[in-house]
């Protein structure tokens, strides 16, 4: 019989996140356990956030948004990663369960954005807005992020 939880030590924040995600996520995927506790060398709020993110990552329904983005490549022509990080930051505390996609190009981006409740697939100075799989309109200019946030709050 395997012993999965024999130690309770946090380690550094990032390594603690990785170890907790792998250990707790692995057990949950195997159907082991009905309660989780994440220990990190961080504020208790960060531990709770990590727990919710682990649950979300293994497919459990969790209140709040899930923000996805692409790893970016040579086709990326706008600040996709920065926008995704800012969207996630602005949605902290938002309780509606939605999947938000911020994709970096017009080649693969539209497919991923269609899979989300709301998403954008960007190009140079613009992004196509998708809501529930349908292209709705182009967002243009220097305030694509603000325009996108307005649309997120509408759904």
Functional labels for PLM-detected ranges:
Residues 42-61, 129-145:
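C-terminal helical cap(s) of enzyme catalytic domains, especially alpha/beta-barrels
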Residues 14-29:
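Conserved alpha/beta-domain cores
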Residues 1-6:
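Short, small-residue-biased leader/transition segments that mark boundaries at the very start
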Residues 7-8, 62-104:
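Small-residue-enriched alpha-helical segments and adjacent helix-cap loops
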Residues 114-115, 121-125, 131, 139-155:
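Terminal leader/tail segments of proteins
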Residues 30-44, 122-135:
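Glycine-rich phosphate-binding active-site loops on the catalytic face of alpha/beta enzymes
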Residues 7-12, 39-43, 73:
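Active-site beta-loop-alpha junctions enriched in small/polar residues
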Residues 27, 70, 105, 113, ...:
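Conserved, mostly hydrophobic/aromatic
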């Amino acid at each position: 019989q395997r012993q999965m939880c024999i130690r309770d030590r946090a380690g550094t924040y990032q390594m603690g996140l990785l170890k907790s995600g792998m250990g707790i996520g692995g057990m949950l995927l195997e159907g082991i356990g009905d309660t989780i506790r994440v220990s990190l060398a961080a504020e208790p709020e960060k531990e709770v956030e990590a727990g919710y993110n682990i649950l979300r990552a293994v497919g459990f329904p969790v209140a709040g948004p899930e923000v996805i983005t692409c790893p970016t490549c040579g086709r990326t022509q706008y600040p996709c990663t920065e926008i995704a990080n800012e969207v996630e930051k602005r949605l902290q505390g938002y309780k509606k369960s939605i999947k938000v996609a911020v994709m970096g190009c017009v080649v693969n981006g539209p497919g991923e954005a269609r899979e989300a409740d709301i998403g954008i697939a960007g190009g140079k100075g613009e992004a196509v807005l998708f809501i529930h799989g349908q292209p709705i309109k182009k967002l243009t200019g220097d305030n694509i992020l603000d325009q996108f946030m307005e649309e997120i709050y509408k759904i």
